[in-house]
Amino acid sequence: MKFELLNQVNLKKDHEIRIYSTCIGCTQCVRACPTDVLEMVPSTTCKAKQVVTVPRIEDCVGCKRCESACPTDFLSIRVYLGGETLRSMGLAY
């Protein structure tokens, strides 16, 4: 399975949220978010015909509850804080 980046939203230089093509449109991450940052939008990339998006990034507190709620093997939504991005993707040297 190919993991494509669907959306990347940067709040600050050191804080970003990435949405991957493995999103199945289940809404678990949306329901888990304590600050209502996420919402579902129509899409043809999954069977549920919807994927998550991040319209209110400025309200993200970096709690990563959306990651914990994601049922896919390859987390469809990831929150990166600081230098965490390269390390967590196995790309740091």
UniProtKB/Swiss-Prot annotation:
Annotated positions binding [4Fe-4S] cluster 2: C33, C60, C63, C66
Keyword Repeat: yes
Family annotation (Pfam families): Fer4_7
GO biological process, one term: photosynthetic electron transport in photosystem I
Record GO terms (molecular function): 4 iron, 4 sulfur cluster binding; electron transfer activity; metal ion binding; oxidoreductase activity
Binding residues for [4Fe-4S] cluster 1: C23, C26, C29, C70
Annotated cofactor note: Binds 2 [4Fe-4S] clusters. Cluster 2 is most probably the spectroscopically characterized electron acceptor FA and cluster 1 is most probably FB.
EC number, UniProt record: 1.97.1.12
Reactions mediated catalytically: reduced [plastocyanin] + hnu + oxidized [2Fe-2S]-[ferredoxin] = oxidized [plastocyanin] + reduced [2Fe-2S]-[ferredoxin]
SUPFAM superfamilies linked: 4Fe-4S ferredoxins
Function as written in the Swiss-Prot or TrEMBL entry: Apoprotein for the two 4Fe-4S centers FA and FB of photosystem I (PSI); essential for photochemical activity. FB is the terminal electron acceptor of PSI, donating electrons to ferredoxin. The C-terminus interacts with PsaA/B/D and helps assemble the protein into the PSI complex. Required for binding of PsaD and PsaE to PSI. PSI is a plastocyanin-ferredoxin oxidoreductase, converting photonic excitation into a charge separation, which transfers an electron from the donor P700 chlorophyll pair to the spectroscopically characterized acceptors A0, A1, FX, FA and FB in turn.
Family matches, as PANTHER family: PHOTOSYSTEM I IRON-SULFUR CENTER, PHOTOSYSTEM I IRON-SULFUR CENTER-RELATED
Subunit structure as annotated in this protein's UniProt entry: The eukaryotic PSI reaction center is composed of at least 11 subunits.
UniProt name for this protein: Photosystem I iron-sulfur center
Chain's gene name: psaC
